[in-house]
């Protein structure tokens, strides 16, 4: 997973949207749960996500077909589904080619 520090570093470089084809941006929860049992530190839970409390950004998980994209030369748009009173939700992500 991506740590809070690594996420903040990306944001400091000008990144405003992150995405992954993995289940989560953070470390697998089984790993985090084991680490939490040892440290009792709540800051390690969803630490990559918590970077958004320091500096706002948008994040997309569970992307697919990334292997079909070229290394550059396209734009990405995300079309969210409206969810009443939600703080997160589904988006349809598309790559736009010239």
Where do the model's predicted regions map?
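Active-/binding-site microenvironments in catalytic and ligand-binding cores
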Residues: 1-98
């Amino acid at each position: 997973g991506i740590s809070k520090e690594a996420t903040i570093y990306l944001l400091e470089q000008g990144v405003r949207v992150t995405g992954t084809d993995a289940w989560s941006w953070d470390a697998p929860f089984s790993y985090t749960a084991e680490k939490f049992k040892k440290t009792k530190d709540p800051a390690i839970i969803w630490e990559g996500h918590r970077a958004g409390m320091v500096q706002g950004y948008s994040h997309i998980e569970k992307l697919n077909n990334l292997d079909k994209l070229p290394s550059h030369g396209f734009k990405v748009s995300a079309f969210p589904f409206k969810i009443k009173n939600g703080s997160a939700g589904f988006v349809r992500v598309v790559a736009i080619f010239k």
